[in-house]
Each structure stands twice: as C-alpha cells, then as structure tokens.
Amino acid sequence: MNNILGYKNENVVVTGAASGMGAGCVERLLEIGANVYALDINEVTAPVTRSITVNIMDRDSIAAAVAELPDQIYSVFNCAGVPCPPVPAYNTVMINFVGMRELTEQLLSRMKRNGSIASVASTAGMAWRSNMENVEKFLANDSFESADAWLKTEEGAALSADAYAFSKQCMIVYMFNNTAQLARKHIRINTICPSPTESAFSQQMEEIGLGKDVTDMFTPSNGQYANGGDMGDALVAINSSLFRFVSGCLIPVDWGYTAEITAGQRDNLLNISL
C-alpha cells in the first residue's frame, strides 16, 4: 500500500467516531492502514483496532479511556460535538471544548515527534475575534475543574449562553494560543471550520426548527451540503505527513463560503473573521 499520507501502522485516536465526521475519518484511516482507536459515548461498529466508550464531559471517563490507549500516538482527531439546543448550554461547552481540551492534553506526552492534532470547529465559531475578551476569560480557567466551575457561575452561564458558537470560538483560540508550544515539541495543531454538513448533528438541528431553510444561508454558492466523509477526508489530509509544515491554521472547509464573505459577495451573517 502506498503510504504517502504516512498513516500506515500508526496509532491514531478519533473522538466522535461512531457517526458523522468522526466516522468519515475512521473509514478513510482504516482504508490507508492506520491503527484506529475510536472513542465515542455511542457504539462504534467499524472494524477499528479498539473501540472505547467515553463520556467526554466527565474527567474520570476521559482518564479511563486514555488508560486504554497506546503509549505512542501519531495523530488525534477531535470530532466529538453536540448542538445547542437541544443539548443544554453547559453540556455543550463541556463536550465541545472542555472535554476536548482535557483529552488532548492528556495525550500530549504520548504523541510522537511530528505528530498532529486536528479539531472540528464550525463557521459558527469564526466570530472568535469579536468575542476574544470573553473567550480568553474562559480559557484562563486552564484545568477541567476550574472550567467546569466557571461555567456554573452566573457570569460563566451568561457569557457562554450562545454555547455552540462559544465552544467553537474557544477551540479556535485555544489552537492559536498553543501552536508555538506544540511546535517546540514538534507537534502540529490545526482546526477546520466546516460548512453545513448532513449528519446526525444536522438532523438534531432540524428537529428544533433549524432546518435547511436556515442552513441554506450558510452553504457555498453551489448549494451543496457536505457529508461526514467530505470532512473526514479533509481532516485526514490535514493531519497527514503531506501537511507536515502546516500548523496553527484555521481552515474553512466550505467550498468557498468564507471566501465569498471575505470578497463581500455574501452578507457576513456570522461575523466571520479569519
């Protein structure tokens, strides 16, 4: 098998592996010979090296999952995520960001030289620049416990009320803040911002009234919705050895939607900035 992407016989970790973009990653990684360690609260049916049940908003569950992972890891794919609503705001930030950060940081000591981390943010998080003060205030709570406690305060609940966008803004700024220190460890970190993607996630959105009449406003000019495989392939490419000098990048995977906004061809409904 041609190993141009560098994954053959390498250990990789995928969260949210049971469905959507995580499942898309798993499928492609298996095809190209990676040893896939799949983490999800739901059952993973793909023939992975190991499937591990984890509740990513629970620190003890994360620690137990990490204990089942190998000593050396080449790549991490942070794909676990939930929408808000219907998921409560506190749970959304804990799953989408706090748990993601905890897992990632517990794995850093196991990552190989020239290892890589890729996380799934969202175009909804690309207003990070205009909300930087609040995001940095939250990120100053740099432990699982302090972040958990802050979200339960009156201030924390208010500042994270738009929980889905806030959690993705935190993910983006966290990447920027940690690129340099990870570079010194020869580890890359990048984040993608997908355009609307058909998945179990999008079905949940439709159930609360945010159907395609809303999400159509955020699709590229070809009107096309992505699928989990489209985003999975992008993540696999970004974490691969072909992208070995790419780090600290916020990468829209949206067939040009962000470019259209940057060029002034579309209304900037989400206050997007790169």
Language model segments and positions:
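Catalytic loop of short-chain dehydrogenase/reductase
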Residues: V82-P86, R113-R184, P196-T197
